[in-house]
Each structure stands twice: as structure tokens, then as C-alpha cells.
């Protein structure tokens, strides 16, 4: 459903939605919430494009018999809008995120060091070129060095990598098109030229030319399973002499995604990039439902690299003085 916005916030709300849609977010239920923001602005008789602390707190306050999930949804959307407004030069109070869910769980992702990554890629190459005694997997071992390199260089989910077809790859722009992935996010993934060359050589070697053909398949030409990749990855970790901490501790295949996000944020902070402006793009790139997941990685980045804590705190404190 298309909603009409009539308050003083209407132009910035429409601009915000254009930005989100342009990044591949469907933002359907969020449009309804933004309509409520617009209606609240009319009720409060706002005459300027600003989100005050009073306005925001009134918008997110809990009503009688209301479920927590509804409050969470309002907090999320008003935070997203406030961050966008700040990035566009408007004053907007950013309410602190709610302490709930996986973002505050005891789980700590495994983040690879640069040396561990070097060992893993060398071990993967060795695994691909060395036949096992029972010849298990040998006829298809050459796919795993490429899969692992794609995982780290793009931050994609393993399920997304295994669903890649020829039609999803653009060798001219060095990019993947991910459609209908988790959270219903369509997005374009830039790929490093070196990684793309590995992939192109593999595709040529395997004579994969049909647009509907999967890239990484088993002997039945079906996508290999995540379980298979996880099993092979444990073998590669063993070759690399990197211990596995056991169930729930890793490292796992998904650790490449965690590492990509943390390393990207680390590099941005070190280079002095505007984290506030870049955050929505990283969130869209990762396919996160909203910025809370990505914010968790920023906190983790600060914990792993204490020397950049001061720089990263600038992002968290942003908007604290913009509520008047």
C-alpha cells in the first residue's frame, strides 16, 4: 500500500524512503510506521523539520496492553529516520537502542586475524590440489578455495553463495545480484577483481554457460549443501592448524561474514570515514533488516581494536546534543 504524507516531515520521509528503496529494501511495513510518524508530527503541530527528544519519546512510549514488539518496531524506525535526518543536516534526536535480542546475547562471533585468513586460504588451496585416500570430494575440491574467498571478500551468507547462478554474475561490473535473500532484501554485491578472476577461471574450467545453472554443484548438478561446506571447512581448519573451539564457539563458515563486517568498519574508522553516513549502506549491503545488527559489529570492532574506540564513540553519541 502506498501511503500519503502530509506533515512538515513529509519531504524528508519521502527522501528517506527513496534512499532505502534505492538500496534494495522493500520497506513495506516500515512505510506504515512512517505514516504514524507523519501523523504524530501533525498532532504535535511541528512547523520545522526536526525530531526533538520530547517528540521521539512520545512516539515510542508504551500504550496500555501493547506488545513489546510494537515498541521495538517504533524505536527502530524512528532511529533510522533520525540518523538519516542527521546525515542530511537536520537536527534529530537518536533514541538509544533497546537492550534486547541477539544484539545483547552472550554469543561472541569469531573474528579471523589477517594471519589466520592467510593460513586458511593456503590450506584451502592445498586441500583442493591433494587427493584423499578414498578420493572423496576430490573431483570437486577446487570449488572450496573460491567459496571461502568469496565469503571473506564479500561478507555474503553461505546460503547466498551456494544459490549463485550464472545469471547473477556480472563480469563487466564485478558484481553479484542477490535476489529474495534473507529479510527479503535484493542487493548488489561488489566483488574484488582478484576474487572475480578466480571465479571466472573456475566457471570456464567447469564449462558452466547456462544462465540458470548453479555455480557450485554436486554430481547431480544441484547446489552443494551448507552442511557439506561446513564439513570441508573443518578439514581446512585442521590443515591450517587453527583449532576449533567446539559447538557454538567456532570458527565457522559464518565467521567470514562477521570478519568482513568488522574489518570493513575497522578500515573506515582508521581512514577517518563518516561512519554515520556510511552505516545505512553497510546495513543494506549486508542484507540486515535494520541497523541494529550492524551496530553490534561496530561495538565489537571497538572491543577488538581499542585504539579506535574514541573514534567509534563519535557515532554512538551522535545526536545526543540535537534534541532541542
Where on the chain are the PLM-derived regions?
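Conserved catalytic core of the tyrosine transesterase superfamily
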Residues: 1-324
